[in-house]
Amino acid sequence: MEPSILLLLALLVGFLLLLVRGHPKSRGNFPPGPRPLPLLGNLLQLDRGGLLNSFMQLREKYGDVFTVHLGPRPVVMLCGTDTIKEALVGQAEDFSGRGTIAVIEPIFKEYGVIFANGERWKALRRFSLATMRDFGMGKRSVEERIQEEAQCLVEELRKSQGAPLDPTFLFQCITANIICSIVFGERFDYTDRQFLRLLELFYRTFSLLSSFSSQVFEFFSGFLKYFPGAHRQISKNLQEILDYIGHIVEKHRATLDPSAPRDFIDTYLLRMEKEKSNHHTEFHHENLMISLLSLFFAGTETGSTTLRYGFLLMLKYPHVTEKVQKEIDQVIGSHRPPSLDDRTKMPYTDAVIHEIQRFADLAPIGLPHRVTKDTMFRGYLLPKNTEVYPILSSALHDPQYFDHPDTFNPEHFLDADGTLKKSEAFMPFSTGKRICLGEGIARNELFLFFTTILQNFSVSSHLAPKDIDLTPKESGIAKIPPTYQICFSAR
């Protein structure tokens, strides 16, 4: 190596060492963690496998509560079922703030029901829960909407005549249509070009959010935002979806009948009108748009991705599929559609769905929280607005609660006599005050879609079960299953 290059490297290393030694200890009484470099934070501890792998390695050294610097900002990690419950449930109000995800912050800006904080969040959450409940209990309940959509899916799958297909698009269609019926007051045909474009944008954006480049962006967003990258494509995609939502809102505004609200949008517009003289109201256009984007995006991608994982697992473990179909045949038969009342009579199927959600581990690092005031937790003082990540994967794979956490096994949710066994560690929707807004709808969707498909079809693959790879395509904010082909053959 050239002497000049060696000299340059030596000077660079020396400069970094001086920076490290001169870097003031600014963590105060934060939990322990790896020493950060100035500006870089703990970038050097970032595993190429992503943030989750990195955090799990650090947990082995520092325990269940530790601090990681994402660039210059300290973030506290919570690992294990008991730790997460102690914070998000035991000190629920203190940990009820929402942190930021840098790659989508330019669009969400702390607006909307998922990323809002303080009184804004409380007002929007109360409104959203009440409105979604009302439109789920009206002339057509959520159950009826899901049953009808499931039958549309059955008709579509019959057209395939058992030929191999990628289920991504169809699973997106059915979950999107449920949230659309509640929020927009309509469902879309599976051939609607605008609908297809939105689903494509959702899929691409969900994958980009979980990419390695988006995880690196969390460390250097203040610098990297000025350069091309996945973050710009994500913003562009989300803006296109927002533009479409804006057209729907304007249509609703033009046809609004105050005496007969049709859906979430109508109800929100009426609330806006009612509070237009209140200059401090949270019911304004920006919160409407971002709430709709949040509900539409989350309601589509989380459910459809779980179904994709579920049926990949059914291909990998055909003996589980056979037992589910046997229970379906015994309890439901073939002459009526599944209903939610069937769930309590089908403990094995219910356990399989729970295990799919646990094993899929769809949101492994959870959405970031933020402490709402100076907070004492396990002897550490977390200053107000400190960001906190509940590592949900560490609960869903907690060996204290699951005998073989890295193995797909429905017995994790069955007791000795075969009845459904609940687990404190089961938190795919998070827990505490920030638990997923659509948890109930999602649970109902998974049961009715899963059982309706297996009531009507056998599933198979051209690959032998042992050759089916479950490795996620991306693992970041979400785990994205690998793409695969599946055959749905009429039973």
Curated annotation (Swiss-Prot):
CDD domains, alphabetized: CYP2B
Localization per Swiss-Prot or TrEMBL: Endoplasmic reticulum membrane; Microsome membrane
Catalytic reactions of this protein? an organic molecule + reduced [NADPH--hemoprotein reductase] + O2 = an alcohol + oxidized [NADPH--hemoprotein reductase] + H2O + H(+)
**May I have one GO cellular component term?**
intracellular membrane-bounded organelle
Q: Does the keyword NADP apply?
A: no
Under the heading InterPro entries, the entry gives: Cyt_P450, Cyt_P450_CS, Cyt_P450_E_grp-I, Cyt_P450_E_grp-I_CYP2B-like, Cyt_P450_sf, Cytochrome_P450_fam2
Q: What is its main location?
A: endoplasmic reticulum
Please outline how this chain is modified post-translation: Phosphorylation is accompanied by a decrease in enzyme activity.
> What are the protein's GO molecular function terms?
arachidonate epoxygenase activity; heme binding; iron ion binding; oxidoreductase activity; oxidoreductase activity, acting on paired donors, with incorporation or reduction of molecular oxygen, reduced flavin or flavoprotein as one donor, and incorporation of one atom of oxygen; steroid hydroxylase activity
* One biological process term in Gene Ontology: nicotine metabolic process
* Induction or repression: By phenobarbital.
Q: Would I find Membrane among this entry's keywords? A: yes
Q: What is this protein called?
A: Cytochrome P450 2B2
Q: Which organism is it from?
A: Rattus norvegicus (Rat)
